């Protein structure tokens, strides 16, 4: 999978503090901010106590990359360790999976639709 070109998207930072304009992701029970609204493309993640996310992914920052359509599953298989299996984080928009690769937490983002439609405000919702 070394030939796959990854496009940097954001850095995710775990936090316990409520952030402005958070969006709730039910599948992982985490509040996230939109990294496109941050000058350094930072995403803050605030986990609910009952979140199924544990370990490295919950405790350490992650780097997120957009991956070409059709490559997510192969990238997951090639990783040192799968931290969170792929799922549709936003229906018909983006599928994501988390891995540990070379000691780092990595999020792979495979867009199926418009990347600008990830967050409610970008879809015209509140």
Mark where each language-model region is.
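Vicinal oxygen chelate
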Residues: 1-52, 78-126
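Mid-chain, well-packed structural core segment of small domains
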Residues: 56-89
